[in-house]
Amino acid sequence: MSYIQVLQLISFAFLMSGGQVLFKKTALSISAGLNNENSLGLIEGILKAATIPWLYMALFTYGIATLFWLYILQRIPLTLAYPFSALAMIIVPILAIFLFGEKLNWSYWIGIIFIFIGITIIAR
């Protein structure tokens, strides 16, 4: 696999991760000011989500990522390309720490190391 192809796959993982962060921002906007006792039902939550710009940015990001994925799959076998999507399982939690103040336990960090090792082996 060429360096350009690896860069494309990493870029795809970052696009998907960005979409996930935007979906989280949407979810936080939906639940802003609510507690568990007066949380919105499914229909009310969907209707409120439709008014939140973060949702449209998330969907746009996923749309671009999907088109980019199709471009990638024209050039790289799925068996080589797909494991790189696991990079999102590394990127998203790290972003969640910095953007949302979420915490990761030690077992998650060990899992991240194994994911990174696996992707490195596949990329060779």
Predicted regions, residues:
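Polytopic alpha-helical membrane proteins, predominantly small-molecule transporters/carriers
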Residues: 1-124
